Amino acid sequence: MTEGAKSTIDQGEVDRFSAMAAEWWSPTGKFKPLHKFNPVRLAYIRDKACENFSRDPKSARPLEGLRVLDIGCGGGLLSEPVARMGASVVGADPSEKNIGIASTHAKASGVSVDYRAVTAEGLAEAGETFDIVLNMEVVEHVADVEFFMTTCAKMVRPGGLIFVATINRTMKAAALAIFAAENILRWLPRGTHQYEKLVRPEELEEPLVASGLEITDRTGVSFNPLSNQWNLSKDMDVNYMLLAKRPT
């Protein structure tokens, strides 16, 4: 198979998320965990981006003037707040239904986001480049992780960043992020995650490094049931985020 014939799309995953599209903006619906997760990942994105681009994280629009890609944007839970930080955001998703929901919500909220029903490879082939690429809770749903990461890396400008958040492929993650989250706590619909599609950090880092990027940060993300909040942690056995930079 030639590289041009490759695809990052797992159509079954696209169809499953399309079927739930109307629930994206319900904080008590099927995407409740993402609503809970949003504050910690937004703070991480803001702080690391400001550190890299010499911005003030306390300013009202700290990402002003930066072009950001939110790949696999879903209903726009991340795209909208990043746009509110001043960034020029392209929200990309292969699901027309997701893009429809995201576009409608952004318009109603008065937020400007360039939503497109397009794949990562479609954007890369068009020569699109960005200061920041957000790859959050997506890699565990794609068809070819290595090709997906390589494709996303191509779109990172010199001096730019790529953020990745996903679930580690460990027995601890299988117990907590799949069995407990889907079957006991019912945080997620059954079948949201499949163990064999979870991704270890090195499986993300290798194609990024091979694409000329440098891994600059890794962090775990853990849920505190007492505070009912997600926090950064040293434990990367379940949820984790990593950051890579293309040298100038």
UniProtKB/Swiss-Prot annotation:
Enzyme class: transferase
EC number: 2.1.1.222, 2.1.1.64
InterPro entries documented for this protein: SAM-dependent_MTases_sf (IPR029063), UbiG_MeTrfase (IPR010233)
Residues at which S-adenosyl-L-methionine binds: 41, 72, 93, 136
Keyword entries, A-Z: Methyltransferase, S-adenosyl-L-methionine, Transferase, Ubiquinone biosynthesis
Disulfide links within the chain: none
Functional summary from the UniProt entry: O-methyltransferase that catalyzes the 2 O-methylation steps in the ubiquinone biosynthetic pathway.
PANTHER family: METHYLTRANSFERASE, UBIQUINONE BIOSYNTHESIS O-METHYLTRANSFERASE, MITOCHONDRIAL
HAMAP family named among the record's database cross-references: UbiG
Protein name per UniProt: Ubiquinone biosynthesis O-methyltransferase
